[in-house]
């Protein structure tokens, strides 16, 4: 788990869940380079003490900034806790982010269950292949 870059994104209704996730898996996350959209990054940093590289808020282009890192092969894993029950004004940006993860084979979790599987896989060394393809 050397220098892997992880993006954390959470819609407003999922921010508290992201904080709980980050606290629960702090020992794993602090071994990685963490990137996040604006408010999510600030909340995670305050709750855990982990340094978070913060982008713009999602609706202001933060999702696209993370997408650019993915397209440049500079992001290894994305945890995006989406709120599927609330319409998002920047839905095209969200879909573009999901698409770029698929195009570049970047592991992506959009709910807590998948996020936990990915973070435990990361801890078990199952994402070391990302270092080999960089």
UniProtKB/Swiss-Prot annotation:
Coiled-coil positions: none
Residues the record marks as active site: 63 (proton donor/acceptor)
Broad EC category: lyase
TM segment ranges: none
Catalysed reactions listed for this entry: dihydroxyacetone phosphate = methylglyoxal + phosphate
Any Pfam family matching the protein: MGS
Ligand binding (substrate): 11, 15, 37-40, 90
GO molecular function: methylglyoxal synthase activity
Enzyme Commission number(s) of this protein: 4.2.3.3
Protein name, per record: Methylglyoxal synthase
Taxonomic lineage: Bacteria, Bacillati, Bacillota, Clostridia, Thermoanaerobacterales
Originating gene: mgsA
């Amino acid at each position: 788990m050397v220098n892997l870059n992880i993006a954390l994104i959470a819609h407003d209704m999922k921010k508290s869940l992201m904080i709980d996730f980050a606290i629960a898996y702090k020992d794993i996350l602090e071994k990685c380079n963490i990137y996040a959209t604006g408010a999510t990054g600030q909340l995670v940093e305050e709750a855990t003490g982990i340094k978070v590289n913060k982008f713009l808020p999602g609706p202001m282009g933060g999702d696209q900034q993370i997408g650019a890192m993915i397209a440049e092969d500079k992001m290894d894993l994305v945890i995006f806790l989406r709120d599927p029950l609330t319409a998002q004004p920047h839905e095209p940006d969200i879909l573009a982010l999901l698409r770029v993860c698929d195009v570049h084979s970047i592991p992506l979790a959009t709910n807590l269950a998948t996020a936990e599987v990915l973070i435990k896989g990361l801890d078990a060394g199952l994402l070391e292949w990302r270092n080999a393809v960089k």
